[in-house]
Amino acid sequence: MLIGIVNLNRFGEPTHLIHSIEKLGHNTHVIGPSDHLTSIIKKSPINHWFFTGSSYDVLSPISPQIDLGLFELKDKHLFMICYSMESALYNLGYKLQKKPRTNRRLFDIVSPDGTRLRVWKSHDTYAPISMNPRLKPSSRYNDEIMTITYKNTIMTQWHPERTTDGIVFMRDWLEN
């Protein structure tokens, strides 16, 4: 299957994501941010799209943002990673908060059923559960929303392409 990637990275290709998708037996097509992104994805024969993380500050007016029209593309399946999740939630009107970035990258997150996943995260902006009571995360780390579903989209505040548990999570999403 051909998988689309919207590369929001400031510098370079999302090589970890590309390699992880290819290891799962799929080919990739990478595009950059565009003012016409929703139209491009709508017209594309590709049905599964990943949106990368980024080192941009999502709260900056010059940073690329997720277009809310993407959530109306019912025949497309979207997977937004880290920065992309922050941008989507911010543009949907949810509250974000800053925290100091840490050098620690591997964390265990917990789903409502108690399942633990080993994940890689590197963000300093996040959506606090306590400030967004309408959101129902499917996994969390302390007060941070780590995984959430909205319409046609799964969003992770972590990078699934960086751990075995994350790659399994990606595989399951692609197969369902």
Question: Where are the regions that the model predicts?
Answer:
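Amide-donor transfer/coupling interface in amidating biosynthetic enzymes
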Residues: 2-24, 34, 45, 97-176
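Short amphipathic alpha-helical surface micro-motifs
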Residues: 12-13, 89-91
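Flexible gly/pro-rich beta->alpha loop and the following alpha-helix that scaffold active-site loops
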Residues: 22-80, 85, 92
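Short catalytic/ligand-binding loop motif for oxyanion handling, primarily in non-cytosolic enzymes
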Residues: 58, 87-90, 128-130, 164
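Residue-level detector of intrinsically disordered/flexible regions characterized by low predicted structural confidence
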Residues: 78, 89, 97-99
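Long, contiguous hydrophobic alpha-helical segments, chiefly transmembrane helices and signal peptides
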Residues: 83, 87, 156-158
